[in-house]
Amino acid sequence: MLAKVISSKNSLPILDCFLFQVANNVMTITASDSDNVIKSVIDLTECEGEGEFCIPNKVILDALKELPEQPLTLDVTPDSYAVKIVYQNGLYNFTAQSAEDYPRTQSMTDAANSIMIPATVLIDNISRSLFATANDELRPIMNGVYFDLTPDALAIVASDGHKLVRNKNFSIKSETPASFNLPKKPANLLKNILTKDGGDVLIKFDDRNAEIKYNDGVLNCRLIDGRYPNYNSVIPTDNPSQTTVDRRALLSALRRVLPFASESSQLVRLHMENGRFEVSSEDIDFATSAKEQLSCEYTGAPMSIGFKGSSLMEVLSNLSSDQVVIMLADPSRAGIIVPAEQPEDEDVLMLIMPMLLNE
């Protein structure tokens, strides 16, 4: 997992290496790309001496990836940096590098803001949000996962301007409002590193950096600078048309109908009326079309609305509830999709912008 931090194009050659630090029967392994630094701590069964050294990531990974799980003995000569790794049936010999030039990270000060989040909550919220982040070089502020801590709740938000995810957790709050914007790379790293039985995660942050401590390691990262847009202002609050439908059934219908939509627009049409939910698509250029009906619970006047099919499928795929509620105001305003049953102490909301229908 540490190897995923290391960039293929590092500005400093030493960052192609892992930093090994041995002290007090503990070995700390560090990987960095200058913006993100991950440290993992390993308890040693036996240790003689202390010190630090660097090993190129390709050397150590190629050496160890073919070995089955077993104890290893690592012997390093301080003067020459000669390394010998002894395993059950053999050994490796190679040369390490001095750790003198490896960049060091500074711990956050006590003045930094902090949040304590259960690992399972953080994993679920980041996993639900990452698909909605942007890849926009002109608006880098939209490329991250935004954490907004208020006296009422912690909101974890992501948006690319076409779709939006807002996760509210009411058990995590702060009298002093604070926020930070976590870049996509460290967010992905956290999603893959953390385990759901990993206890609580402590996040300390200031205007520029964050330090995230979990059960057996720490991630330091640079934050995205800038003011995040007012995400609440784009969420319609008056949505008289509401459809409750089986999430998996709707996903399956979209998979069948979407191939018949225009390849360029991927427009699918949803029509709701008197307990009838119709999903359809059409490609006028190739004279193809598809239509499928689902059962639903619907309140409101008959309505047709268009969405980009692939985006709607992404939204539905990142929810886990059996049923979802689609809330609409009119065909020109954003649609809101929420789980029919919200997770405990949470309010999960996804928003998707509509597309113009050719009536």
Where are these regions (language model features)?
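Structural preference for solvent-exposed beta-strand-turn elements
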Residues: M1-E359
